[in-house]
Amino acid sequence: MTAAAALLVAVAFDLACGEPPAAVHPVVWMGSAIQALKRAAPAGGRAAELLFGALMALAVPCFFAALGAGVAALLAPHPVLALALSGLLLKPTFALRALRDAAYGVRDALEAGDVTGARGALRSLCSRDPSELDEPALVAASVESVAENASDSFVAPLFYFALFGLPGALFYRAVNTLDAMVGYHGRYEYLGKASARLDDALNFVPARLTALLLLAAGWLRGADARRGLAVLLRDGGLTESPNAGRPMAAMAGLLRVELEKRGHYRLGDPVEPLRRGLIDEACRIVVLATLLFAGLAAALLAAVSFGLGQELFR
């Protein structure tokens, strides 16, 4: 029961307060550790970089998972304290309010007619170069990022919390942070390869689960769920990432729009124009989808805690 309550406490804290200060934010600590390891990485030599990168991909997540396990063990005899602290420690592994607020930053700038400001705000959502994006492209990039990050920033960490507790959520967040910092082409091609592959593996189920949650939330909000499913099945595998395209394609279908990253992919069909109000609707669908998942996960954790899980799966 403590795990279910801690999950709900963490979600409530996120929606009410947002992100904790950087000094006490575990993801900031992860970033600092990764930055130090990047500086210590061997210079040159693919084999050396691959080996060092593989060690990074295991050492950093395992270290933070071990910290989570240690905290959980210390708190086990104290249920009330465990509830409060577990919720506070779980919160930094996901970021729903920050995701929504970043998207609203793009929307607000567009509503003010400030395309340059919207391009700057988009940098908080994704790593794409926004310098040449016009308003429709900024809307598309925002909608894509909100949909994709519904998985990375919310569903995935809570999925691993439900399976493995606080250590699971911290392990996932460390892997995802590694992928963000070194798991891309270019300078860190070989250093980040293991992190990128591990991130792909960990996100395989959550990304597809997120797409289904978006369809359910979209249906509840009166969006075109039938088209959402069709576009998910048709276009979900068109992105370079094996996972990112699933929630993005579902969202494209729900909103009846085409989401394009020029030179890379096109998801959905241009039935409706890319207007700035779609950022609001995408955020509403994502918030509803993630809250549905949080409620479902909490209910399952509570059921298992009360011993109902054994009866259900006997």
Swiss-Prot record:
Name the keywords, alphabetized. Answer: Cell membrane, Cobalamin biosynthesis, Membrane, Transmembrane, Transmembrane helix
| Topology of this chain in the membrane | Multi-pass membrane protein
- Supply the Pfam families for this chain: CobD_Cbib (PF03186)
> What processes does the entry annotate via GO biological process terms?
cobalamin biosynthetic process
Associated pathway: Cofactor biosynthesis; adenosylcobalamin biosynthesis
Single GO molecular function: ABC-type vitamin B12 transporter activity
Q: What is its main location?
A: membrane
Spell out where the chain crosses the membrane. 55-75, 152-172, 200-220, 285-305
- Quote the cellular component terms of the Gene Ontology held in the record: plasma membrane
Which InterPro entries would you find in this protein's record?
Cobalamin_biosynth_CobD/CbiB (IPR004485)
Where is this gene product found? Cell membrane
Q: Specify the domain of life of the species encoding this protein.
A: Bacteria
HAMAP family from the UniProt entry:
CobD_CbiB
Xref: NCBIfam families: cobal_cbiB
Outline what the protein does: Converts cobyric acid to cobinamide by the addition of aminopropanol on the F carboxylic group.
Family named by the database record: Belongs to the CobD/CbiB family.
Q: What is this protein called?
A: Cobalamin biosynthesis protein CobD
Q: In the UniProt record, what gene is named as encoding this protein? A: cobD
